[in-house]
Amino acid sequence: MMVPAAVVDNTIADLLHHLEAGDILIDGGNSYYIDDIRRAKDLAPKKLHYVDVGTSGGVWGLERGYCMMIGGEDTVVKYLDSIFATLAPGIGNIARTPGREKVAGTSEQGYLHCGPNGAGHFVKMVHNGIEYGIMAAYAEGLGILRSANVGNRKHEIDAETTPLRDPEHYKYDLKLPDIAEVWRRGSVIASWLLDLTAAALLEDPALSKFAGRVSDSGEGRWTIKASIDEAVPAPVLTTALQERFSSRGEGDFQNKLLSAMRYEFGGHLEKPAGK
């Protein structure tokens, strides 16, 4: 299966009529790992096996191969090894980690049995949380570069506007497609996500076909919940998730309330949009 997390249980219920003892269900989508644990327990009395596979690679996976993070019983995962080996990218042209040649396992091939039921989707969950943070960092950094010409703009002079000190320090008209491209070439922050960013900026520097309403499919939220349960600080991942909420207007009421309080205590009027 590779279906949205919200319909996995219904899909399993439909499939049960066609399954026999010893059959294996593979969930290759982005289910919540806690649901994986429950499903494996529910299916065990029927002698059905459940394997959770966190799959990364996006639409490019068909060409590049899929990175897979796997959770399930040892014997079952070993039985499926040839399937995972076929779908995985293999070592390819990625340089080996020094010392890795002495380590047995499949991780270099692009797939890994992470642990018992739920472990595969747990690792993929955190992978996606990290993805949120990396994407946010690129977006914020390039946003700062895009506004590096703010010193050339006309600025309102009133009590509601923070003055720009030293506007002569911000008079750079920077070409973001070229900057993203040069970063791809030997920089510390080079990555596949940066490759995709460079391609998008080259095609349309203004990103005119996007409204900037960024969805979240659940993995970021689950990652933050896990960080709270584990008492592990994750401020970058948390902020990246919260920013996605804000991008969809989820903070509009709070912002209106801030404006209302400023008006009540100081008579401050909201400035029109774009001012």
What are these regions (language model features)?
Residues 1-38, 42-48, 61-74:
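Rossmann-like NAD(P)-binding element
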Residues 47-56, 81:
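Short, acidic/small-residue loops that bind anionic groups at enzyme active sites
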Residues 24-29, 125-126, 209:
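Short glycine-rich or small-residue beta-strand-to-loop segments that form or flank ligand, phosphate
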Residues 63-88, 124-132:
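Short beta-strand and adjoining strand-loop segment in the mid-core
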Residues 78, 85, 92-125, 135-275:
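NAD(P)-dependent Rossmann-like dehydrogenase/reductase catalytic/cofactor-binding core
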